[in-house]
């Protein structure tokens, strides 16, 4: 709320880090919006930027953009191509990890954010720039898929029900 107030004085606002596990509510006049990826100054119709330290779930981002457009807000969004992408296997890992802890659960939301950042740290993640390079994307998915499936089933003892050919990133099938 404070950021939204301050943002009206600047040309751009940046979402610096995190993922869609951290949301914020913006009230501007009669409009109340809930964002988790889009920077809070979006209603000011200024440049909004997402830095490389943000884990992006493309479906969530597309829904937030659609919400703004439905309200007639012009979206001037810049995304660092090095942003890492939340892939369905990150969510599978998150759920399996949480389920394997029994009574010692941490209360994860199951959104896969932590596992996306783990891939970022290990230099194994899929980045936004990979989404426009089909061969690179496919190769990275195949490399990661086997490892993630093995981890879910063997390390966490959970079922891995995802099928690679059925993976959607955003609204596009891979």
Segments and roles (model prediction):
Residues 1-171:
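Non-transmembrane, aqueous-exposed alpha-helical and coiled segments at domain scale
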């Amino acid at each position: 709320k404070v950021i939204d107030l301050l943002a009206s004085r600047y040309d751009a606002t940046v979402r610096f880090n995190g993922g869609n596990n951290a949301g914020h509510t913006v009230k501007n006049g009669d409009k109340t919006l809930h964002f988790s990826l889009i920077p809070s100054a979006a209603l000011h119709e200024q440049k909004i930027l997402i830095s490389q330290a943000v884990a992006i779930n493309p479906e969530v981002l597309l829904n937030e953009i659609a919400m703004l457009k439905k309200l007639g807000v012009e979206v001037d969004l810049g995304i660092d191509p090095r942003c890492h992408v939340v892939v369905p296997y990150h969510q599978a890992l998150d759920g399996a990890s949480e389920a394997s802890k029994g009574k010692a659960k941490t209360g994860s939301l199951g959104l896969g954010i932590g596992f996306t950042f783990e891939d970022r740290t290990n230099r194994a993640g899929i980045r936004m720039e990979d989404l426009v390079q089909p061969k690179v994307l496919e190769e990275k998915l195949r490399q990661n898929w086997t490892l993630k499936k093995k981890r879910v089933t063997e390390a966490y003892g959970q079922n891995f029900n995802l099928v690679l050919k059925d993976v959607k990133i955003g609204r596009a099938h891979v």
